A protein has these predicted regions:
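N-terminal signal peptide c-region/cleavage motif recognized by signal peptidases
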Residues: 3-5
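Extended, solvent-exposed segments with strong compositional bias
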Residues: 96-126
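Acidic, negatively charged sequence tracts
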Residues: 77-98
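N-terminal small/polar-rich segments of proteins
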Residues: 8-84, 119-160
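Generic structural motif
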Residues: 24-27, 86-92, 109-113
């Protein structure tokens, strides 16, 4: 037989914190091929061209982003009477340290690009920073009717 006398007490704490990282996105500039003449052939907008697309992603420093850039392979006429299309190809590059400078960008090398947000050079320990995604590419203008041709570029961002 055991005898136990005295006082016993215990304290348990269960603390749970849910921290949701935030990501803010903004189209700084749309990709724009402008007006082109039928049968012009290939028209390129290169990295650094004034008409390239620029997309900004603001996030917490050290946050990892998975960025996917998808697009249709052709531009379509907005007119219902015109079935013509324009072949369309794009490329993408990014900076991940809060500076909008295409000369310091890294080209996308895979379908899903893994990007780690770093602090800007002027304040490397800043809580927030930005990545810039640059969209550029080419269209091939054949013998097509005059019209407005459009297409979509979809940028998907998953943050971890």
């Amino acid at each position: 037989m055991f005898a136990f006398s005295g006082t016993a007490s215990a304290q348990f704490l269960n603390i749970q914190l849910d921290v949701e990282p935030e990501v803010d996105t903004m189209i700084e500039q749309s990709l724009n091929f402008g007006q082109v003449v039928s049968n012009t052939g290939e028209v390129n907008i290169g990295l650094g061209d004034t008409n390239m697309g620029i997309f900004r992603v603001s996030a917490l420093r050290s946050q990892k982003l998975l960025i996917t850039v998808e697009h249709s392979n052709e531009l379509r006429s907005v007119s219902n009477s015109n079935n013509a299309t324009i072949p369309f190809d794009i490329e993408a590059a990014y900076t991940n340290f809060g500076v909008n400078d295409y000369r310091q960008s890294t080209p996308f090398t895979s379908v899903i690009e893994e990007v780690l947000i770093e602090g800007p050079p002027i304040n490397p320990t800043a809580t927030w920073s930005s990545a810039y995604v640059y969209i550029y590419g080419s269209i091939d203008i054949g013998n097509i009717p005059s019209d407005i041709y459009t297409g979509e570029v979809q940028i998907t961002i998953v943050y971890e």
